[in-house]
């Protein structure tokens, strides 16, 4: 076994062109599968093809794919509609629960357009709309959008001319963090539905193999006078895991003997305003009370990033 200190690192991209987004998707996915060492300058294309359906996406048929990592790739669009297609596109994002739309925000902020505050006259021609969405929204809705807009190319190609590669304060900004802590603490954060979440796989990854560290990681926390008890318990759990693996049981079966203190790595992405809502419930620095001390530790580190 090995003790691992809780950590938080920000991996929000600096650019949002298509290649940068694909590289970000690969990075988030490889964190889940502990294969960052396989990333190269050009590996993003092949990796993307391993996590999405080879045929045209059908949500009723395609379920055995890792689409959650697509959510971490943020897409920023600036649309000043003058055609029916552009008006339809703005309307789509206003009603999409995973997107945020700011209207007329040359100095930042502006008017937030949502489904609940939406003027039923529809988007207005000639008005600036600053849209923040993510790759999965376009991917899962592509058939609907292509059909509604009468496109011959993909929705990704159609929206290229509206992309903003370096977003400013006109947009609702999204931030991505990599969190290393125990599974018991990731559960605290995974309850927040505003977060896009991709967690390291214990179904496919055997941490006791040399290429995955050679030991089961356990979250390092304040054990007081009971350090030896926890150490013995974790060593026993690791040995039981190894014993099950030695009789050819797969990781997804052997993992059943691992405790909630087992270390985990999670990628979280959310709008800044949603992060602030989470922190008000989890971070001592944001005024939260009665929160698990290990969750406070993680939340306070995220708070420091957001307020740097």
Q: What positions do the PLM features span?
A:
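Family-specific signature for flavin-dependent thymidylate synthase
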Residues: 1-308
């Amino acid at each position: 076994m090995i003790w691992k200190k809780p950590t938080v690192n920000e991996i929000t991209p600096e650019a949002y062109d298509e290649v940068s987004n694909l590289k970000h998707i690969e990075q988030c996915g490889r964190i889940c599968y502990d294969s960052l060492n396989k990333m190269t300058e050009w590996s993003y294309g092949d990796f993307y093809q391993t996590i999405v359906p080879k045929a045209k996406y059908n949500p009723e048929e395609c379920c055995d794919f890792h689409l959650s990592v697509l959510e971490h790739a943020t897409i920023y669009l600036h649309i000043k509609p003058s055609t029916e297609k552009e008006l339809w596109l703005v309307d789509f994002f206003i009603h999409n629960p995973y997107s945020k739309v700011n209207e007329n925000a040359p100095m930042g902020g502006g008017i937030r357009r949502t489904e609940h505050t939406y003027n039923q006259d529809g988007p207005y021609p000639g008005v600036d709309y600053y849209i923040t969405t993510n790759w999965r929204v376009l991917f899962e809705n592509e058939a609907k959008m292509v059909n509604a807009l009468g496109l011959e190319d993909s929705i990704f190609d159609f929206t290229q001319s509206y992309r903003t590669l370096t977003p400013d304060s006109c947009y609702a900004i999204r931030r991505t963090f990599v969190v290393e802590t125990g599974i018991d603490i990731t559960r605290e954060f995974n309850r927040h539905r505003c977060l896009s979440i991709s967690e390291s796989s214990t179904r496919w990854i055997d941490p006791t193999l040399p290429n995955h560290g050679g030991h089961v990681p356990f979250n390092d926390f304040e054990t007081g006078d009971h350090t030896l008890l926890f150490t013995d318990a974790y060593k026993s759990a690791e040995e039981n895991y190894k014993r099950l693996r030695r009789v050819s049981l797969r990781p997804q079966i052997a993992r059943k003997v691992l405790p909630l203190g087992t270390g985990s790595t999670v990628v979280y992405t959310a709008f800044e305003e949603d992060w602030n809502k989470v922190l008000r419930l989890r971070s001592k620095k944001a005024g939260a009370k009665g929160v698990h001390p290990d969750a406070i530790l993680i939340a306070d580190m995220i708070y420091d990033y957001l307020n740097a």
